[in-house]
């Protein structure tokens, strides 16, 4: 596969690199904001699960254009390359200490908006992925209840499923309006969407806590069909299609043929704006590049062949020829895995 193939298959990936966004997800936030104006008048914003930082970039660009005194706090477990004007916290969003640090950076005040584009590493088992995403939204809501001011807004990624209406009903207990937003840059074939909760109004007597394992119980059978205030598609319908492949020649693929001289420049491949600084998979990649896994595989194959050969001589069953767990652990220890 050529290095330009993804530029052809994913126009938003290509545009993100050309416009110096760290990820294509920047367009999702911009399209939601264009539709709902959720960043208008915001002076304090929190970006949860922020790495690699594309949503923080959008916050920085749009908030500082309107108010130079705005403050932005980005939180992630992983380290993230610096972004001008963004305060970065490497911490756990399930920790009260992290919430206290946010409020400290805001000089004792609470945030106008909390956004979260986080998602678990998907397994391909849809029910499990949906459950893990729901757990992440719960964690995001828990810290949001500590740092969001009344009247503030909350935006989070969700994976749509048959149980999604329960989540909307639960959120409606804390926010006056709940929308389901689907940006144009989010692939239509994906179950990804964004729950947008407007005007934070917690119930009387509500005490924020990080210990919640679920939102307040709601009888799913009693959910009203109008629990969501609207399903909204965001973005220009005549614009780029996230499902379509485009030619590298910008003249041939620009919608409606409306391009200026700057956009007519010859296509040039660009690397990603900001690769991960210290990804969790880096150690595994280093071991793979150094040949550790190949050596381990070869060693185990030799051991298995020897056992099979010995088994034939001693007439062992196939199950008896397989290396034991202890033998595999010794092999792994040998290669420092």
From Swiss-Prot:
Molecular function GO terms recorded: S-adenosyl-L-methionine binding; tRNA (cytidine(32)/guanosine(34)-2'-O)-methyltransferase activity; tRNA (guanine) methyltransferase activity; tRNA methyltransferase activity
Start-end of Basic and acidic residues biased regions: 304-318, 327-337
InterPro entries from the UniProt entry: RNA_methyltr_E_TRM7 (IPR028590), RNA_methyltr_RlmE (IPR050082), RNA_MeTrfase_FtsJ_dom (IPR002877), rRNA-MeTfrase_E (IPR015507), SAM-dependent_MTases_sf (IPR029063)
Keywords: Cytoplasm, Methyltransferase, S-adenosyl-L-methionine, Transferase, tRNA processing
Pfam families reported for this sequence: FtsJ
Keyword S-adenosyl-L-methionine assigned: yes
GO cellular component: cytoplasm; cytosol
Similarity section: Belongs to the class I-like SAM-binding methyltransferase superfamily. RNA methyltransferase RlmE family. TRM7 subfamily.
Cited function: Methylates the 2'-O-ribose of nucleotides at positions 32 and 34 of the tRNA anticodon loop of substrate tRNAs.
Protein name per its UniProtKB record: Putative tRNA (cytidine(32)/guanosine(34)-2'-O)-methyltransferase
């Amino acid at each position: 596969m050529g290095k330009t193939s993804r530029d052809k298959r994913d126009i938003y990936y290509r545009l993100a690199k050309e416009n110096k966004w760290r990820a294509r997800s920047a367009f999702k936030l911009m399209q939601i904001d264009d539709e709902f104006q959720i960043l208008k008048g915001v002076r304090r914003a929190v970006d949860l699960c922020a790495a690699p930082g594309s949503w923080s970039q959008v916050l920085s660009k749009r908030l500082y254009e309107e108010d130079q005194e705005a403050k932005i706090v980005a939180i992630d477990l992983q380290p993230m390359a610096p972004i001008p004007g963004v305060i970065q916290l490497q911490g756990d969003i399930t920790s009260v200490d992290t919430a206290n640090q946010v409020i400290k950076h805001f000089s004792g005040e609470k945030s106008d908006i909390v956004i979260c584009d986080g998602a678990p590493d998907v397994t391909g088992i849809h029910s499990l992925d949906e459950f893990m995403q729901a757990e992440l939204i719960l964690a995001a809501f828990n810290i949001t209840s500590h740092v969001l001011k009344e009247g503030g807004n909350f935006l989070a990624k969700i994976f749509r499923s048959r149980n999604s209406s329960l989540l909307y009903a639960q959120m409606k207990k804390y926010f006056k309006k709940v929308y389901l937003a689907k940006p144009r840059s989010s692939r239509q074939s994906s179950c990804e969407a964004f729950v947008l909760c407007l005007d934070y109004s917690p119930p009387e007597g509500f005490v924020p806590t990080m210990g919640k394992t679920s939102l307040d119980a709601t009888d799913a059978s009693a959910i009203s069909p109008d629990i969501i205030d609207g399903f909204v598609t965001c973005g220009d319908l005549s614009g780029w299609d996230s499902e379509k492949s485009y030619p590298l020649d910008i003249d041939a693929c620009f919608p409606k043929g409306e391009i200026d001289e700057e956009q007519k420049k010859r296509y040039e491949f660009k690397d990603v704006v900001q690769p991960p600084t210290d990804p969790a998979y880096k150690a595994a990649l280093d071991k793979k590049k150094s040949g550790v896994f190949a050596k381990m595989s070869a060693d185990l194959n030799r051991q298995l062949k020897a056992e099979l050969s010995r088994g034939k001589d001693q007439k062992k069953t196939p199950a008896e020829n397989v290396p034991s767990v202890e033998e595999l652990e010794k092999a792994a220890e040998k290669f420092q895995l």
